[in-house]
From Swiss-Prot:
InterPro entries cross-referenced by the UniProt entry: ADC_dom_sf, NDX1-like
Reported consequences of knocking out the gene: No visible phenotype under normal growth conditions, but mutant plants lack neoxanthin.
Biological process according to GO: xanthophyll biosynthetic process
Protein name: Protein NEOXANTHIN-DEFICIENT 1
Described function: Required for neoxanthin biosynthesis. Probably not involved directly in the enzymatic conversion of violaxanthin to neoxanthin. Is necessary but not sufficient for neoxanthin synthesis.
Protein backbone atom coordinates (compact mmCIF):
# COMPACT_ATOMS: atom_id res chain seq x y z
CA UNK A 1 0.00 0.00 0.00
CA UNK A 2 1.36 3.45 -0.88
CA UNK A 3 2.07 5.97 1.83
CA UNK A 4 -0.72 8.46 2.44
CA UNK A 5 0.44 12.01 3.15
CA UNK A 6 -1.05 15.35 4.09
CA UNK A 7 0.55 18.76 4.43
CA UNK A 8 1.63 20.06 7.85
CA UNK A 9 1.17 23.74 8.61
CA UNK A 10 4.28 25.66 9.63
CA UNK A 11 4.77 28.67 11.89
CA UNK A 12 8.49 29.10 11.12
CA UNK A 13 8.06 31.77 8.43
CA UNK A 14 7.08 30.35 5.06
CA UNK A 15 8.68 27.14 3.73
CA UNK A 16 10.88 26.16 2.08
CA UNK A 17 13.58 27.17 4.57
CA UNK A 18 17.03 28.01 3.20
CA UNK A 19 20.29 27.30 5.03
CA UNK A 20 23.74 28.32 3.73
CA UNK A 21 27.17 27.32 5.01
CA UNK A 22 29.35 24.20 5.05
CA UNK A 23 29.06 20.67 6.42
CA UNK A 24 30.71 17.30 6.97
CA UNK A 25 28.56 14.26 6.18
CA UNK A 26 30.03 11.07 7.63
CA UNK A 27 28.50 7.62 7.14
CA UNK A 28 29.02 4.92 9.80
CA UNK A 29 28.22 1.27 10.24
CA UNK A 30 25.82 1.33 13.18
CA UNK A 31 24.70 -1.75 15.09
CA UNK A 32 21.10 -2.53 14.21
CA UNK A 33 20.30 -3.09 17.88
CA UNK A 34 21.46 0.44 18.70
CA UNK A 35 19.56 2.03 15.81
CA UNK A 36 16.31 0.20 16.64
CA UNK A 37 16.18 1.99 19.98
CA UNK A 38 15.28 5.17 18.08
CA UNK A 39 13.09 3.77 15.29
CA UNK A 40 9.28 3.77 15.75
CA UNK A 41 7.81 0.28 15.71
CA UNK A 42 5.75 1.27 12.65
CA UNK A 43 8.91 1.41 10.51
CA UNK A 44 11.33 -1.31 9.48
CA UNK A 45 15.07 -0.79 9.82
CA UNK A 46 17.13 -1.36 6.67
CA UNK A 47 19.93 -3.66 7.84
CA UNK A 48 22.36 -6.34 6.74
CA UNK A 49 24.49 -8.65 8.91
CA UNK A 50 23.38 -6.81 12.05
CA UNK A 51 24.27 -3.29 10.85
CA UNK A 52 22.60 -0.29 9.24
CA UNK A 53 23.98 2.92 7.71
CA UNK A 54 23.97 5.84 10.12
CA UNK A 55 26.51 8.48 11.08
CA UNK A 56 26.29 12.24 11.44
CA UNK A 57 25.88 15.56 9.65
CA UNK A 58 27.95 18.37 11.20
CA UNK A 59 27.03 21.76 9.76
CA UNK A 60 27.97 25.38 10.31
CA UNK A 61 25.40 27.81 8.91
CA UNK A 62 26.30 31.44 8.25
CA UNK A 63 22.85 32.26 6.89
CA UNK A 64 19.54 30.66 7.90
CA UNK A 65 16.05 31.53 9.18
CA UNK A 66 17.52 31.24 12.70
CA UNK A 67 20.67 33.22 11.87
CA UNK A 68 24.19 31.89 12.38
CA UNK A 69 24.35 28.56 14.22
CA UNK A 70 25.96 25.10 14.33
CA UNK A 71 24.18 21.77 14.05
CA UNK A 72 25.05 18.14 14.71
CA UNK A 73 22.54 15.62 13.39
CA UNK A 74 23.18 12.11 14.74
CA UNK A 75 21.74 9.65 12.20
CA UNK A 76 20.61 6.36 13.74
CA UNK A 77 20.10 4.52 10.45
CA UNK A 78 17.97 3.99 7.37
CA UNK A 79 14.33 2.99 7.74
CA UNK A 80 11.90 1.57 5.20
CA UNK A 81 8.27 2.54 4.74
CA UNK A 82 7.15 1.49 1.24
CA UNK A 83 7.75 2.91 -1.25
CA UNK A 84 10.51 4.98 0.40
CA UNK A 85 13.60 4.47 2.54
CA UNK A 86 14.83 7.50 4.51
CA UNK A 87 17.27 8.44 7.25
CA UNK A 88 16.14 8.67 10.88
CA UNK A 89 17.76 11.16 13.26
CA UNK A 90 18.59 9.90 16.74
CA UNK A 91 19.41 13.38 18.03
CA UNK A 92 19.80 16.91 16.71
CA UNK A 93 22.05 19.30 18.63
CA UNK A 94 22.00 23.03 17.83
CA UNK A 95 23.36 26.15 19.52
CA UNK A 96 20.23 28.15 18.74
CA UNK A 97 17.07 28.22 20.86
CA UNK A 98 15.03 29.27 17.83
CA UNK A 99 16.34 26.44 15.65
CA UNK A 100 15.76 23.95 18.47
CA UNK A 101 12.15 25.07 18.95
CA UNK A 102 11.43 24.94 15.22
CA UNK A 103 13.00 21.51 14.85
CA UNK A 104 10.92 20.12 17.69
CA UNK A 105 7.55 21.67 16.89
CA UNK A 106 7.47 21.89 13.12
CA UNK A 107 9.80 19.18 11.82
CA UNK A 108 9.36 16.60 14.58
CA UNK A 109 13.09 16.36 15.29
CA UNK A 110 14.63 15.23 18.61
CA UNK A 111 16.34 18.62 18.94
CA UNK A 112 18.33 19.74 21.97
CA UNK A 113 20.22 22.95 22.70
CA UNK A 114 23.98 22.41 22.77
CA UNK A 115 27.28 24.23 23.04
CA UNK A 116 29.86 23.93 20.25
CA UNK A 117 33.45 24.77 21.22
CA UNK A 118 35.91 24.92 18.31
CA UNK A 119 39.69 24.95 18.40
CA UNK A 120 42.11 24.86 15.45
CA UNK A 121 45.74 23.80 15.88
CA UNK A 122 48.58 23.12 13.45
CA UNK A 123 49.66 19.48 13.17
CA UNK A 124 53.40 18.75 12.69
CA UNK A 125 54.46 17.68 9.22
CA UNK A 126 54.28 13.94 8.65
CA UNK A 127 55.90 11.47 6.30
CA UNK A 128 53.84 10.10 3.47
CA UNK A 129 51.59 7.28 4.64
CA UNK A 130 51.63 4.50 2.03
CA UNK A 131 48.45 3.08 3.54
CA UNK A 132 46.58 6.05 2.13
CA UNK A 133 47.63 5.52 -1.48
CA UNK A 134 44.01 5.50 -2.60
CA UNK A 135 43.33 8.74 -0.75
CA UNK A 136 46.36 10.29 -2.44
CA UNK A 137 44.36 10.14 -5.66
CA UNK A 138 42.18 12.84 -4.12
CA UNK A 139 45.11 14.65 -2.49
CA UNK A 140 44.41 13.27 0.97
CA UNK A 141 47.59 11.33 1.79
CA UNK A 142 50.06 12.80 4.26
CA UNK A 143 53.33 14.26 3.04
CA UNK A 144 56.44 16.05 4.26
CA UNK A 145 55.76 19.28 2.39
CA UNK A 146 52.23 20.20 3.44
CA UNK A 147 51.26 20.72 7.10
CA UNK A 148 47.73 19.99 8.26
CA UNK A 149 45.34 21.87 10.48
CA UNK A 150 43.38 20.01 13.12
CA UNK A 151 39.99 21.39 14.07
CA UNK A 152 38.49 19.99 17.26
CA UNK A 153 34.79 20.48 17.88
CA UNK A 154 33.58 19.76 21.40
CA UNK A 155 29.82 19.30 21.63
CA UNK A 156 28.05 19.60 24.99
CA UNK A 157 24.31 19.28 25.51
CA UNK A 158 22.80 22.08 27.60
CA UNK A 159 19.89 21.45 29.96
CA UNK A 160 18.97 24.53 31.98
CA UNK A 161 22.15 25.54 33.81
CA UNK A 162 23.81 22.12 33.48
CA UNK A 163 25.74 20.78 30.50
CA UNK A 164 26.74 17.25 29.50
CA UNK A 165 29.65 16.42 27.22
CA UNK A 166 28.49 14.47 24.17
CA UNK A 167 31.59 14.02 22.04
CA UNK A 168 34.74 15.52 20.55
CA UNK A 169 35.08 15.57 16.77
CA UNK A 170 38.55 16.00 15.27
CA UNK A 171 38.68 17.05 11.62
CA UNK A 172 41.96 17.22 9.71
CA UNK A 173 42.37 19.57 6.77
CA UNK A 174 45.15 20.01 4.23
CA UNK A 175 43.91 22.84 2.07
CA UNK A 176 47.39 23.59 0.66
CA UNK A 177 47.77 20.18 -0.90
CA UNK A 178 44.46 20.16 -2.70
CA UNK A 179 44.77 23.82 -3.63
CA UNK A 180 41.50 25.53 -4.40
CA UNK A 181 39.80 22.35 -5.57
CA UNK A 182 36.56 21.94 -3.65
CA UNK A 183 35.11 19.12 -5.71
CA UNK A 184 32.36 19.19 -8.33
CA UNK A 185 29.16 21.15 -7.91
CA UNK A 186 26.28 18.75 -7.32
CA UNK A 187 22.61 18.72 -6.48
CA UNK A 188 21.24 16.01 -4.23
CA UNK A 189 18.27 15.23 -2.01
CA UNK A 190 18.39 13.82 1.51
CA UNK A 191 14.89 12.61 2.46
CA UNK A 192 14.22 11.89 6.12
CA UNK A 193 11.52 10.57 8.41
CA UNK A 194 10.88 12.26 11.76
CA UNK A 195 8.25 12.77 14.46
CA UNK A 196 6.94 10.43 17.15
CA UNK A 197 8.25 12.79 19.85
CA UNK A 198 6.69 14.46 22.87
CA UNK A 199 6.63 17.73 20.89
CA UNK A 200 5.18 16.30 17.67
CA UNK A 201 3.49 12.91 17.84
CA UNK A 202 2.88 12.64 14.08
CA UNK A 203 5.07 10.52 11.84
CA UNK A 204 6.56 12.90 9.28
CA UNK A 205 8.59 12.95 6.10
CA UNK A 206 10.60 15.91 4.85
CA UNK A 207 13.21 16.51 2.17
CA UNK A 208 16.45 18.50 2.16
CA UNK A 209 17.63 19.60 -1.30
CA UNK A 210 21.35 20.36 -1.34
CA UNK A 211 23.38 22.34 -3.86
CA UNK A 212 27.07 22.36 -2.97
CA UNK A 213 30.67 21.51 -3.79
CA UNK A 214 31.47 18.03 -2.52
CA UNK A 215 34.70 16.06 -2.13
CA UNK A 216 35.80 12.99 -0.14
CA UNK A 217 37.89 13.70 2.95
CA UNK A 218 39.46 11.75 5.78
CA UNK A 219 36.80 10.55 8.23
CA UNK A 220 36.71 12.69 11.35
CA UNK A 221 37.87 11.06 14.58
CA UNK A 222 35.10 10.97 17.18
CA UNK A 223 35.83 10.41 20.86
CA UNK A 224 33.77 10.48 24.02
CA UNK A 225 32.94 8.57 27.18
CA UNK A 226 30.46 5.74 26.74
CA UNK A 227 28.82 3.91 29.63
CA UNK A 228 29.53 0.18 29.88
CA UNK A 229 25.81 -0.58 30.02
CA UNK A 230 24.93 0.83 26.59
CA UNK A 231 23.79 -2.59 25.38
CA UNK A 232 21.49 -2.80 28.39
CA UNK A 233 20.05 0.61 27.50
CA UNK A 234 19.50 -0.63 23.96
CA UNK A 235 17.42 -3.59 25.07
CA UNK A 236 15.33 -1.55 27.47
CA UNK A 237 14.82 1.30 25.03
CA UNK A 238 13.54 -1.16 22.46
CA UNK A 239 10.57 -2.01 24.66
CA UNK A 240 9.91 1.15 26.73
CA UNK A 241 10.42 4.90 26.90
CA UNK A 242 13.89 5.51 28.35
CA UNK A 243 15.32 8.43 30.25
CA UNK A 244 17.15 11.32 28.62
CA UNK A 245 20.48 9.94 29.80
CA UNK A 246 19.88 6.58 28.12
CA UNK A 247 19.09 8.36 24.85
CA UNK A 248 22.31 10.34 25.17
CA UNK A 249 24.33 7.17 25.66
CA UNK A 250 22.80 5.53 22.61
CA UNK A 251 23.44 8.65 20.53
CA UNK A 252 27.08 8.51 21.63
CA UNK A 253 27.22 4.88 20.53
CA UNK A 254 26.12 5.95 17.04
CA UNK A 255 28.78 8.67 16.93
CA UNK A 256 31.48 6.23 18.10
CA UNK A 257 30.60 3.54 15.55
CA UNK A 258 32.88 2.67 12.62
CA UNK A 259 33.14 5.33 9.87
CA UNK A 260 33.23 4.17 6.25
CA UNK A 261 33.19 7.41 4.24
CA UNK A 262 33.20 11.17 4.82
CA UNK A 263 32.14 13.93 2.44
CA UNK A 264 32.86 17.62 2.80
CA UNK A 265 30.17 20.03 1.59
CA UNK A 266 31.29 23.57 0.78
CA UNK A 267 29.36 26.51 -0.68
CA UNK A 268 26.32 24.69 0.69
CA UNK A 269 22.78 25.86 0.04
CA UNK A 270 20.21 23.57 1.64
CA UNK A 271 16.50 23.94 1.00
CA UNK A 272 14.29 22.21 3.55
CA UNK A 273 10.72 21.52 2.48
CA UNK A 274 7.73 21.59 4.81
CA UNK A 275 7.17 18.17 6.40
CA UNK A 276 4.17 16.03 5.54
CA UNK A 277 2.33 13.58 7.76
CA UNK A 278 2.71 9.96 6.68
CA UNK A 279 0.90 6.78 7.59
CA UNK A 280 2.87 3.53 7.83
CA UNK A 281 2.15 1.07 5.06
CA UNK A 282 0.39 -2.09 6.14
Amino acid sequence: MDVEEKRVSSGYAKPPWIFKGSALYQIHLVKAATARAFIPKEFRLVEAFGYTLGGFFLASYDDSPAGVFDELVVIAGIVWNPPTSCAWAARVLVNSDEACHHGRKEVGLPSQVARFSKNITAVPKQKRDRAFGFLDTFGLGTTLSHPENLMEVKVSEVDSAASTDICNIQIRSDETKVGNWMGPAIKMALPSFSGNTIYNSNLLKYSCHLHCRVRPVRPAVVSGALEDETEKFTEQNHTSQESLENERQLSKAVMLSKPIIALQFKCLTMQVEAPVVIYPSK
